[in-house]
Amino acid sequence: MAPRAWGAGLALPGMALLLCGFTPPPQWLPITAQWCLTPNRCIALEVADTPERQSKGLQLRPALPPLRGMWFPYSPPSLARFWMHRTPEPLDMLFVRGGQVVAIEAHTTPCLRLPCRSYGPDQEVDGVLELAAGQAEALGIAVGSPVGIEPVTITPGRPPARPPSAPAPD
């Protein structure tokens, strides 16, 4: 078969999957950072540090367990707008600038169909932290709370941390 025909032959099954409502799997990132609220109470963080990772975020994921979250860093600071498209569980969104929480969107509502509401303050932020709904209040996090995101060393040969409900990598 000619190369052009091969390309069309490979594209058709992919198009069929999209038209049939194929949904890509959720992303599971390793724990590479933490935010310690006290010396003995740290939130383990997946870091969505690329545009692709940020666009997927926590879509299609089950509820986050306590003391787990996803960090979305922005350098340079940006006007960040988040939505809950294809995110089945409510979240708390903490918007961070200059090492402190500048805004909180608590108990954001899942949105399984477009259009979806967007969340975010009318100011640039250095990053956004997503936690399970209710965790900000439960942990005593409020606007003005200091934020210190620190890297976590991953041990070579050890699989990345993931919740028990997460599927094992192929």
Model-assigned labels for residue ranges:
Residues G9-C20:
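Bacterial N-terminal signal peptides
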Residues P24-D170:
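Compact, glycine-rich, soluble single-domain proteins
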Residues M1-P3:
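N-terminal secretory signal peptides that target proteins for export/translocation
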